[in-house]
Design a protein with these regions (language model features):
Chain A
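Positively charged n-region of N-terminal signal peptides that target proteins for export
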Residues: 1-5
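Bacterial N-terminal signal peptides
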Residues: 7-18
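Pepsin/retropepsin-fold aspartyl endopeptidases
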Residues: 24-163
Length: 163, 195
């Protein structure tokens, strides 16, 4: 009898270690803070990103924006290297601002957050008045992130090179 | 006693020991398994206690939009959960500040209630081309099971879809935001249901 009781206790205890009730849920989604460093790929430019659940779409600070047919040319802010980029336009986004309706080109970017790569759509606009060059909005956060505002810079971007 | 100290190595070794013990005589087995069983029971109780404690301080997961109830008036408002906003803000129509009291109405869609609240501060807002000063008041609202007292800035938000923006000043009270979801919690504070 005693042996069976001990075995039962052991199995109950073992199940706690094997299936911790809270860990199982936390694993599905990655918790990030309100600001995270990300890498712009393939150029490996590091940018701090504001994680913004109030923004429907992500946006990037693009300086000297020039649209040529289906492509857009712009520079990253000087603070982050001032890299000149040329990307195909995949769409346009209409944004209501205090000055009226604005049309912003949308491009697809590859970014590295933590150890994972993501392809995500961002709209381009001059954000020189705002603190962060990249805003990650809900279209990106739906890829499996939850936001904890008590934290910031929870991850270091470190993606393995593409094969 | 000797067996018990050996047992601290781990579960599998414990199982092997149990097998070996079962081959020994009954009296000796009783002597061994009683303290071992007791130790495990104690560990189990401790683990359960720790788990429960962890749950009490658990972070509440909320979606990108949540219904909150403004107290004590019990007005339900949909709120945009915004990690990009440092402070929260409320849609105030016909706003008027006299003698440090802010007078305003909630949007018609949410009952048009007239409110008078003391101004606790002013927030400078930098828009693209003009500067603005907005009054800050304190409100109490119920979000999920929690009654929250928080500062909100007042401004006319008639061009925006949500009458209340919940920013980081509220979200730092142990909430995490999951954008795949909305309306995760229904307001369930005692104060909402009691007369």
């Amino acid at each position: 009898m005693d042996r069976w009781l001990s075995l039962l206790l052991l199995s109950v205890l073992g199940s706690f270690f094997l299936f911790p009730p809270k860990m199982a849920r936390a694993e599905e989604k990655v918790t990030i803070g309100t600001v995270e460093d990300v890498l712009l790929l393939p150029w490996k430019v590091k940018l701090p990103a504001r994680i913004d659940t109030g923004a429907a779409k992500s946006s990037l600070d693009a300086r000297e924006l020039k649209v040529a047919e289906d492509r857009v040319e712009f520079k990253l802010p000087g603070k982050y290297g001032g890299l000149q980029l040329r990307l195909p336009i995949v769409g346009w986004r209409h944004v209501r601002t205090p000055e009226g309706l604005e049309r912003r080109p949308v491009v697809e970017l590859e970014i590295c957050v933590g150890a994972k790569r993501f392809r995500t759509l961002v709209n381009l606009t001059d954000r020189s008045l705002v603190k962060y060059p990249l805003i990650l909005g809900r279209n990106f956060l739906r890829e499996g992130f939850v936001v904890d505002v008590r934290r910031r810079r929870t991850s270091i971007p470190n993606c393995p090179d593409a094969p | 006693m000797l067996l018990e100290t050996k047992n601290s190595g781990g579960g599998t070794r414990f199982l092997l020991l149990m097998k070996r013990v079962s081959k020994q005589n009954r009296a000796q087995r009783k002597f061994v398994s009683l303290p071992v069983g007791l130790a495990f029971l104690l560990a189990l109780v401790l683990l359960l206690l720790l788990w429960e404690k962890g749950r009490a301080g658990e972070k509440l997961t909320i979606g990108e939009v949540e219904d909150v109830v403004l107290m004590p008036w019990r007005v339900t408002l949909p709120a945009r959960i915004d990690t990009g906003a440092a402070t929260s803000s409320l849609d105030a129509r016909d706003l008027n500040v006299k003698n440090n009291i802010a007078e305003f109405r909630l949007p018609k869609k949410y009952g048009n209630l007239q409110l008078h609240l003391p101004v606790v501060g002013w927030q400078k807002v930098r828009s693209a081309d003009f500067r603005e000063r907005r009054p800050v008041v304190e409100i109490t609202f119920c979000m999920g099971p929690r009654l929250i007292r928080a500062q909100v800035t007042l401004n006319d938000r008639s061009t925006v879809s949500y009458p209340l923006i919940i920013g980081r000043n509220v979200l730092k009270e142990n909430f995490v935001v999951d954008c795949v979801r909305s309306n995760c919690l229904s307001p369930s504070c005692q104060e909402v249901s009691s007369p």
